Amino acid sequence: MPRRIKIFDTTLRDGEQSPGASMSLEQKIKMASALERLGVDRIEAGFPVSSPVQFEAVQRVSATVKKAEVVGLARCVQRDIDAAYDALRDAAHPMLHIFIATSPLHREYKLKKSKEEILDTVRECLNYGGKGFSRMEFSPEDASRTEPDYLVEVVKTAIECGATSINIPDTVGYAVPKEFGQLISFLVEQVPQFSDGSVDLSVHCHNDLGLALANSLAAVRSGASQVEVTLNGIGERAGNCPMEELIMSLDVRKDMFDVETGIHTEYLYPTGKLLQSITGLLIPRNKPIFGDNVFVHESGIHQHGVLNKRETYEIMKPERIGRSSETIIMGRHSGKHALEDKLSQYNIKLTRQQFEDVFARFTAIADKKKEVYDEDLFSIVGTVLGGVVKGFSLLYFHTFTGNSLIPGATVKVRSEAGEKVASATGDGPVDAVFNAIDECVGINARLKEYIIHAIGSGKDAQGEVKLEVEIEGATYGGKASSTDIIEASAMAYLNAVNRFELRKR
């Protein structure tokens, strides 16, 4: 039977320490609920003593979360422990997390304490914490740079004083996988409570050298029973071990790890996107698991392979993490197989000569653009066929807005049925344009996601809009770019509507 690995999420505490990642109380509650749905075992809600806002956040999360353990951080200081106890009073499953640094650098320059003084502090604080908590985690900060024999002494002392979980932090991301794995193996050998499972052995790895995931996986193979993570890898400096990367590494490579977690992987991507929307920290396009490029293929050779058998170039299914399965990006490296597949999605049927003409025109455009959008293909096919491909196209738009005006828009759209003009108001000019388009096309679409980013720099930079809309219970994506972000938004919205219309037919 696979060994069970606990997932300790610290997105709300360590993750929020990432510059620009601060969250409001309501946002923290929303994230905590999403993390609980995801299936994490422990949620570190904050550092209660650090501020009234942190205290209230831990308090509110404690009252919201019912299944996962809610954790409050504290230094080895009695007032910190008291604050954590008060903040966690309403938690169904409260846990105290106490830490103190143990490495020579921290002992000499930060704490100015001897080894024995630190051991005395550990005894005093854990004994005090045990009066209010049945579950306590202890972290010897900077453990990876602490003398191994002294680290064992500190760990054994903490367990004797009531710690039910010991966390080994690579606080500054200094360790490398072989070294960190050996440290975990050494602790398992020296501390019987780790091998018999009566005390959790946790790891908390930072990513300063880009090794947080590798070190965490090395620790799991060496006997760690819990891994501390953040969604999207956010956190101090270079961040923490990304939950999504750890979970899918363990999932995809079961042959190497033979472990299981309680994570419902189909909620990974939606939860990561929720965090992005709350913090505004964009997920890089090439980020493992969550990046936009992970499940898309532009190379003709790769596209041909994926169209025949997805496993040729994909080691996991996007649906496994809650992503859509659209995988082909049309660009300069795309081949005929990919173009045929894209046209078939819209039920566009061509003779062999017409297809060759379309492919030649497509190649010419692809050499000039990073990505060829569906609207470009519609235009090419329309030119070759001598008519308009089924769908809607934007003829013009006009918007007005201001701090004392209700934003509005007028839009003119062309389709097979003719041209139509509509006006609408909205919560800003983009929303007004979308509402006007709905009037023109006669469809009620609900915007689910809207992302914009710059292509290039300076005054000639283009804004690329990527969005998703829900129509009749199904989700359709759209993309477009323009130097005018409202125009790009309108074109992307029509792109999504055209996907619905053309696939419906």
Swiss-Prot record:
Residues 5-269 form the Pyruvate carboxyltransferase domain. Signal peptide: none annotated. Residues 393-505 are annotated as: Regulatory domain. InterPro entries: 2-IPM_HCS-like (IPR050073), 2-isopropylmalate_synth_dimer (IPR013709), AIPM/Hcit_synth_CS (IPR002034), Aldolase_TIM (IPR013785), LeuA/HCS_post-cat (IPR054691), LeuA_allosteric_dom_sf (IPR036230), LeuA_bact_synth (IPR005671), PYR_CT (IPR000891). One of its GO terms (cellular component) is cytoplasm. Its EC number is 2.3.3.13. It is found in: Cytoplasm. It catalyses: 3-methyl-2-oxobutanoate + acetyl-CoA + H2O = (2S)-2-isopropylmalate + CoA + H(+). It comes from the Bacteria. Keywords: Amino-acid biosynthesis, Branched-chain amino acid biosynthesis, Cytoplasm, Leucine biosynthesis, Manganese, Metal-binding, Transferase. Its cofactor is Mn(2+). GO terms for biological process: L-leucine biosynthetic process. Pathway: Amino-acid biosynthesis; L-leucine biosynthesis; L-leucine from 3-methyl-2-oxobutanoate: step 1/4. Catalyzes the condensation of the acetyl group of acetyl-CoA with 3-methyl-2-oxobutanoate (2-ketoisovalerate) to form 3-carboxy-3-hydroxy-4-methylpentanoate (2-isopropylmalate). Belongs to the alpha-IPM synthase/homocitrate synthase family. LeuA type 1 subfamily. NCBIfam families: leuA_bact, PRK00915.1-2, PRK00915.1-3. Homodimer. This is 2-isopropylmalate synthase. It comes from Sediminispirochaeta smaragdinae (strain DSM 11293 / JCM 15392 / SEBR 4228) (Spirochaeta smaragdinae). The lineage of its organism: Bacteria, Pseudomonadati, Spirochaetota, Spirochaetia, Spirochaetales.
